[in-house]
């Protein structure tokens, strides 16, 4: 069965922003290769202006976020939904709910609505108490107005089952292992030096960037610490100002060249992953696929992916201890190998696309059967 599928809730593809854009890029192209007609909604501000990408139809909708800030996200999602109502999609896949679930009453009436439930957005410390309360409400609305649900983490799946008594489908993100060509392109001279630590994240408090850099700053390490991520926001400016006296810390900004990012991950002595909120994080999977040795913030999300194949820290003191004491020996090599095995057999993109396709087909069949039985269609 070939379906008409609309993917909403992202800023658009190809990815220039984050996790949902990343997975939408892979899943949409993968579904097209399997014969489905897929449309992805893009912000009109997206740098990719064509109406087609790798067989995926691109629909640009007006997005005033650049004019009015966060409120613009709600307007953008409303515009996407209003257009989707005209398209006669068999399935609408909503990537997240923070600014779309308030429009639940205008979700396309005859489409099967599937929502990827994101990663406990209301826990993010960057939000005020009022915003956190709204996000809890938005989560509740997403449960109410969706027919089916996807969780990208078993932790999220368990939370939704306990909180709302709903059964969501676990489908994680994916990552690609090195191709032979990519492996040949790695800078082996730099790899042999292994003279730097690495962190890649959005500059947000819940990513524990301050604790990581504070721990490194207080250490006696002679290595450099490279930080990848846009430092243009308020927190990013605070972080760069706080640590600008440490010549070992290098803020590299955002790097969108995936080959370069993967080489940096692969060549690092130790890769720090500080994310503490959310489901399966794409940058963590990419670090695993890039064969980096990983030190992760100690929380259920990271442990559900890495289990015993990483070092863990909870605060700056823990970071300092890792910076000063981690050695690259046989046990560490086994950690890297085990994580690569997880990418190959658990978090590979073909398996992820398989999961999305089979779940979408199952949901469409089930809902239409129910509608026939109840006389709704």
Residue ranges and their predicted role:
Residues 2-3, 10-16, 30-68, 155-157, ...:
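N-terminal strand-loop element at the rim of the active site
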Residues 6, 188-207, 213-220, 225-226:
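Conserved donor-binding/catalytic core segment of Leloir-type glycosyltransferases
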Residues 46, 200, 223-237, 250-255:
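Glycosyltransferase donor-sugar binding loop
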Residues 72-85, 89-117, 279:
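An aromatic- and histidine-rich active-site surface loop
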Residues 82-85, 131-149, 158:
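Membrane-proximal helix-turn-helix segments that form the acceptor-binding/catalytic region
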Residues 270, 289-296:
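Short hydrophobic beta-strand element within catalytic cores of glycosyltransferases
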Residues 275-276:
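Aromatic "clamp/platform" in nucleotide-sugar-dependent glycosyltransferases that forms part
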């Amino acid at each position: 069965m070939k379906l008409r599928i609309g993917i909403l809730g992202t800023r658009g593809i190809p990815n220039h922003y984050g996790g949902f854009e990343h997975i939408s890029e892979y899943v949409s192209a993968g579904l097209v290769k399997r014969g489905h007609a897929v449309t992805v909604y893009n912000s009109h501000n997206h740098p990719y202006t064509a109406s087609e990408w790798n067989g995926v139809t691109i629909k640009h909708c007006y997005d005033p976020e650049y004019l009015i800030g966060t409120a613009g996200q709600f307007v953008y999602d409303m515009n996407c939904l209003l257009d989707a109502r005209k398209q006669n999609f068999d399935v609408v896949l909503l990537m997240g709910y923070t600014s779309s679930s308030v429009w639940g009453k205008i979700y396309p009436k005859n489409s099967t609505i599937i929502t990827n439930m994101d990663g406990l957005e209301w826990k993010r410390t960057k939000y005020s108490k009022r915003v956190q309360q709204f996000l809890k409400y938005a989560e509740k609305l997403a449960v109410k107005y969706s027919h089916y649900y996807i969780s990208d983490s078993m932790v999220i799946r368990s939370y939704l089952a306990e909180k709302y008594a709903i059964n969501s489908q676990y489908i994680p993100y994916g990552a690609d292992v090195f191709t032979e060509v990519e492996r040949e392109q790695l800078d082996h001279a730099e790899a042999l030096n292994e003279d730097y630590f690495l962190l890649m994240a959005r500059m947000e408090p819940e990513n524990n960037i301050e604790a990581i850099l504070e721990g490194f700053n207080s250490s006696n390490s002679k290595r450099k610490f490279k930080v990848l991520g846009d430092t243009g926001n308020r927190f990013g400016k605070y972080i760069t100002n706080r640590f600008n006296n440490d010549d070992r810390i290098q803020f590299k900004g955002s790097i969108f060249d995936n080959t370069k990012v993967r080489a940096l991950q692969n060549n690092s002595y130790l890769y720090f992953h500080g994310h503490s909120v959310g489901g399966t994080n794409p940058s963590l999977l990419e670090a695993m696929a890039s064969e980096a040795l990983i030190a992760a913030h100690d929380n259920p999300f990271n442990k559900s992916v890495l289990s015993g194949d990483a070092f863990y820290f909870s605060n700056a003191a823990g970071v300092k201890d890792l910076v000063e004491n981690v050695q690259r020996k046989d046990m560490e090599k086994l950690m890297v190998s085990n994580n690569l095995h997880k990418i190959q057999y658990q978090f590979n993109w073909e398996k992820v696309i398989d999961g999305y396709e089979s779940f979408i087909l199952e949901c469409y069949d089930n809902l239409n059967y129910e509608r026939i039985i109840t006389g709704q269609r």
